[in-house]
């Protein structure tokens, strides 16, 4: 109950605050953008496994779960390089790095007023779907291959 009240209190304060006049202050940033201006060489720690061996049973499982054919050598090479890259990322030291919710979490973002422009168009929206059930969209199951 306290959480709901505090959320409502914050919403009232945020609604009174004029965010439209607040602009993003990029002077606090080291650069004008988070993207480096010049290429940065990233050195990953060397791992012992240069090539990961994947057995046929695991490949069949991955094909069934992801609905991607891994028949060609190029697909297996891409899978292998992705696993190697994930292994390198797993060994990066992030001990003193604070997690971010967003890149601009210390900046005020502009909010717009919530205005209903169109409403009660449920029937028109449901006409766009191939299959509906009781005012819901029905999507195909993800674990069954589609007919080609």
UniProtKB/Swiss-Prot annotation:
GO terms for biological process: glutaminyl-tRNAGln biosynthesis via transamidation; mitochondrial translation; regulation of translational fidelity. InterPro entries: Asp/Glu-ADT_sf_sub_c (IPR036113), GatC (IPR003837). One of its GO terms (cellular component) is mitochondrion. Keywords: ATP-binding, Ligase, Mitochondrion, Nucleotide-binding, Protein biosynthesis. It is found in: Mitochondrion. Pfam families: GatC. It catalyses: L-glutamyl-tRNA(Gln) + L-glutamine + ATP + H2O = L-glutaminyl-tRNA(Gln) + L-glutamate + ADP + phosphate + H(+). Its EC number is 6.3.5.-. GO terms for molecular function: ATP binding; glutaminyl-tRNA synthase (glutamine-hydrolyzing) activity. It comes from the Eukaryota. Its main location: mitochondrion. PANTHER family: GLUTAMYL-TRNA(GLN) AMIDOTRANSFERASE SUBUNIT C, MITOCHONDRIAL. This protein may be expected to contain an N-terminal transit peptide but none has been predicted. Belongs to the GatC family. Subunit of the heterotrimeric GatCAB amidotransferase (AdT) complex, composed of A, B and C subunits. Allows the formation of correctly charged Gln-tRNA(Gln) through the transamidation of misacylated Glu-tRNA(Gln) in the mitochondria. The reaction takes place in the presence of glutamine and ATP through an activated gamma-phospho-Glu-tRNA(Gln). This is Glutamyl-tRNA(Gln) amidotransferase subunit C, mitochondrial. It comes from Drosophila pseudoobscura pseudoobscura (Fruit fly).
């Amino acid at each position: 109950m306290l959480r709901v009240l505090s959320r409502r209190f914050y919403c009232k304060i945020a609604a009174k605050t004029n965010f439209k006049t607040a602009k993003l202050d990029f002077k606090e940033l080291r650069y004008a953008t988070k993207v480096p201006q010049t290429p940065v060489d990233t050195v990953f720690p060397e791992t012992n496994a240069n090539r990961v061996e994947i057995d046929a049973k695991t490949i069949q499982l991955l094909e069934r779960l992801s609905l991607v054919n891994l028949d060609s050598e190029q697909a297996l090479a891409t899978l292998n390089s992705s696993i190697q890259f994930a292994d390198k990322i797993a060994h990066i030291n992030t001990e003193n790095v604070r997690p971010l919710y967003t890149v601009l979490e210390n900046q005020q973002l502009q909010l717009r007023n919530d205005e209903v422009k169109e409403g009660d168009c449920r029937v028109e929206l449901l006409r766009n779907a191939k299959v509906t059930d009781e005012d819901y969209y029905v999507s195909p199951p993800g674990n069954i291959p589609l007919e080609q």
